[in-house]
Amino acid sequence: MIECRGVSFSYDGAVPALDGVDLNIEDGEFFCILGGNGSGKSTFAKHLNALLQPDAGTVRINGMDTRDETKTWDVRAACGMVFQNPDDQLVATLVEDDVAFGPENLGVPSAQIAQLVREALKGVGLVGFERHETHALSGGQKQRVALAGVLAMEPRVLILDEASSMLDPRGRKGLMKACRALHARGMTIVMITHFMEEAAEADRVAVFQT
């Protein structure tokens, strides 16, 4: 469960990007945060896996306070994040190597990594792409590889920070299909978007305003 109480944050003491946000997200929920540019929705997303810390208030992930530095990696393991530009997350030449990168750095045994890669690619509809070069993929395929790389680390919560905003309609459709399948399997989804049709897929929607 994600619990946010009175979360406020500003960049360099400027106008607050977040001002007293109170929000709960339940386990297994598909939750969407909708808003325009500058509304603070991406800033809020970065608080959910401790990339940013609140100036005031608290963010708790399964009871863990994100301000507790001893829990930072546990928080990030629980909350996997997919960003706007997949090229910023892809690190390897081949798809299977990219998806394996996270588990390898966590020290997961090789045999288990192979299974995690298979399951992650299956979850995003990219079985058969293992030996494809990442640079040759479409934007939508790249984003699904980035998603698979996060899934291979087995997070409990998936955060998508404007993950579809750089994709064409076909790519967005493929990403949403993967998200629906993951949600059907019980994963908590937090989607940050400005697309109304994506928000319509969610169980609940919070609207952030500038």
Q: Where would I find each of the regions flagged by the language model?
A:
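The feature captures the beta-strand-to-loop junction immediately N-terminal to the Walker
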Residues: 34-36
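Helix-to-loop junction immediately C-terminal to a conserved catalytic motif
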Residues: 49
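Conserved ABC transporter NBD signature motif
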Residues: 57-67, 75
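Conserved ABC ATPase "signature" region
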Residues: 111-129
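Conserved ABC ATPase signature
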Residues: 133-137, 141
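Catalytic Walker B motif of ABC-type/P-loop ATPase nucleotide-binding domains
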Residues: 158-161
